[in-house]
Amino acid sequence: MSSTSLYAAIDLGSNSFHMLVVREVAGSIQTLSRIKRKVRLAAGLNSDNTLSAEAMERGWQCLRLFAERLQDIPPTQIRVVATATLRLAVNAGEFLAKAQEILGTPVQVISGEEEARLIYQGVAHTTGGADQRLVVDIGGASTELVTGTGAQTTSLFSLSMGCVTWLERYFADRSLTKENFDLAEAAAREVLLPVADVLRYHGWKVCVGASGTVQALQEIMMAQGMDERITLAKLQQLKQRAIQCGRLEELEIEGLTLERALVFPSGLAILIAIFSELNIQCMTLAGGALREGLVYGMLHLSVEQDIRSRTLRNIQRRFMIDTEQAQRVGGLASHLLSQLDGSWELDPLSRDLLLSACALHEIGLSVDFKRAPQHAAYLVNNLDLPGFTPAQKKLIATLLLNQTNAIDLSSLHQQNAVPPRVAEHLCRLLRLAILFASRRRDDLLPAIQLTAQDEQLTLILPGNWLDEHPLGREMVDQECQWQSYVHWILRVASGDTLK
């Protein structure tokens, strides 16, 4: 691979230093390496905003690691930015001079507004869902809040509060008491007060979080089998659990890594304040943030309206999926679904995820026909799919695992993107669409009617279709059997005959 196709973005944050190395592939980016080190620079700021020698040394030590990787990348394709702590530090010049010497490239201290803009761009390029969004990023020493539509921001704010500074200020004794949480939340709400009205005025349809705190919450919820949406009720539950633990060094929550535990309570307090003050109903994890914003900025790639569609097209191209067949199966699945509108109510996101599964259902063939569903599930689980959250990826993989033959009901119940019953409905529709499109010709698709009464499905096929298609009849009989094994009732009507 030529080094000229490589790009690097480095973010000198207040809690961690990050480096992202990518290459451009089909209008998107392919991640080649990510390096992250907890430097906790903000913890080295004293009351006069002077950065301690120890904190600076921790930072320089990390940059020596990064410098080795940067030697392979053209300087014009590297961007290094520093955020809140180095905006505040009165002796930032000393740190930056040596940082530039180590890296061999300029380090730009960006304003809070510029940081917010870049975070939003990173989210816009990598996160699916509704166009009108609120983006929240809780850093080590600042918190960015941005509203926008598509690629355009409508308001951006960078506030002086972060998980490291709040840790030092409100949890300095490492005690996880209700009093400490109350103080931290009240202080965060005070910081939010001047900007809350403007953010609410611009409004949003979806809220996404793009920080380590939100990543930690996602990991906790996945580990505990909850759905991936972050709500105030879940945040309050986690706060109670932290208070029960009593002390920071004794904080144990299933799914919370040791690395994230130190700044988790302070980040949690800030997030609870944001949810309460802005009346946020739910939040999901963003696909990217500041570093992705830097990289996409260097590549001058425009923001696509539908990131999920771009991702699916790229995957289809890469794995040489038959797109006509994928569309055929998707069209039939949509047709079947539209007939069940009154009985099986599926929300727009569930419909989208069903069509995404249709688009990728033959990806397993790129490995081998034998065990193709298992190959498909493995690939989808392990591919980078911009626009899809981890839980959505898991659902699509689970649907593909169950697209034919025996049904693994437990896998449908273990995913946490949609309720188990919805996953079952999506699976049944996908299987029927694949079965009836198996001849791979539009003119051979039968005119199917589908009705549902609770969990019982009735398929009504035209006239003599079953008599004229002996293989089709066999496949339908087999499908009825597969579904009956997991207590799904599928009845088939042809004319006046009901099976």
From Swiss-Prot:
Secretion signal span: none
Catalytic activity: guanosine 3'-diphosphate 5'-triphosphate + H2O = guanosine 3',5'-bis(diphosphate) + phosphate + H(+)
Hydrolase listed as a keyword: yes
Pfam families: Ppx-GppA, Ppx-GppA_III
EC class: hydrolase
The UniProt record lists the keyword ATP-binding: no
GO terms, molecular function: guanosine-5'-triphosphate,3'-diphosphate diphosphatase activity
A Gene Ontology biological process term: guanosine tetraphosphate biosynthetic process
Family annotation (InterPro entries): ATPase_NBD, GppA/Ppx_hydrolase, Guo-5TP_3DP_PyrP, Ppx_GppA_C, Ppx_GppA_N, PyroPPase_GppA_Ppx
EC number of this enzyme: 3.6.1.40
Keywords, sorted A to Z: Hydrolase
Pathway annotation: Purine metabolism; ppGpp biosynthesis; ppGpp from GTP: step 2/2
Family of this protein: Belongs to the GppA/Ppx family. GppA subfamily.
Functional description taken from the UniProt entry: Catalyzes the conversion of pppGpp to ppGpp. Guanosine pentaphosphate (pppGpp) is a cytoplasmic signaling molecule which together with ppGpp controls the 'stringent response', an adaptive process that allows bacteria to respond to amino acid starvation, resulting in the coordinated regulation of numerous cellular activities.
Protein name: Guanosine-5'-triphosphate,3'-diphosphate pyrophosphatase
